[in-house]
């Protein structure tokens, strides 16, 4: 397992190098510059700003300098947020995005598995059909549409939750539901199909023949094996939640990394765009690695196959 993790860490470093390189040159190829905008600066001032930030140097020199900075976990200064570096923006925005993302992931896992298990236990009954309708709705409706519907119903009409902002737990409820709706629907479908397959397996029939009650069979034997596809989906789910947070944070006025990223695109703040992209890439790669390790812990067959490959 340690050899496997070591190899994955090496692959992560190579992947990050490619991401940093591609992101850097894409930003350089973008039309305009960080100081181009509706209000054009005098040429002298723009030249001084370019010299101050090292943007007047040859492209390869800028690239090598940026690689060295990223290797030291320094993403440079922000062009638009005065007196703040990209690291400062990440430090202030990530706890907010992490809180929202963690709440959405936990909500998606809890409700998705619950609905999937209920649908499997009551296969081809009204409970199963109800869950099917809910999952179709969750998969079909984009998160930003869900956000607008939740704001209209629960904030503007019923007045149960605030429309936007980030001051207390009440402000997290609607955005976390909007962010969790699609992954929750996928998890419910995965759990249902996997649970039905497990419930029809031989060892479940043997457990029932031994006189074990239905709850005991479900909790002790069925759910653990049925959760394997859900664990596999956790990596893509993390990516889905992170990318979805860009729009959700903007809609709900949440001061997280997603909102900073969207604002940086509008403001041509290239260092923030590159820094947040690299930071999110690190988070996603770590999530995928953790999911792979968890999968090996849950399913010993995977652990054995990895050990054989590493030998």
Swiss-Prot record:
A Gene Ontology biological process term: sporulation resulting in formation of a cellular spore
Organism: Bacillus subtilis (strain 168)
Residue ranges of the TM segments: 9-29, 100-120, 130-150, 168-188, 226-248, 278-298
One of the Pfam families matching this protein, by short name: BPD_transp_1_N
CDD domains, per database record: TM_PBP2 (cd06261)
Induction annotation: Positively regulated by TnrA under nitrogen-limited conditions.
GO MF term set: peptidoglycan peptide transmembrane transporter activity
GO cellular component: membrane raft; plasma membrane
InterPro entries attached to this UniProt entry: BPD_transp_1_N (IPR045621), MetI-like (IPR000515), MetI-like_sf (IPR035906)
Function: Part of the ABC transporter complex OppABCDF involved in the uptake of oligopeptides. Probably responsible for the translocation of the substrate across the membrane. Required for sporulation and genetic competence.
Disruption phenotype: Inactivation of the gene results in a sporulation-defective phenotype. Disruption confers resistance to bialaphos.
Name of the protein in question: Oligopeptide transport system permease protein OppB
Subunit (UniProt): The complex is composed of two ATP-binding proteins (OppD and OppF), two transmembrane proteins (OppB and OppC) and a solute-binding protein (OppA).
Subcellular location: Cell membrane; Membrane raft
Topological category with respect to the lipid bilayer: Multi-pass membrane protein
Residues of the ABC transmembrane type-1 domain: 94-295
Keyword Plastid among record annotations: no
Keyword DNA-binding attributed: no
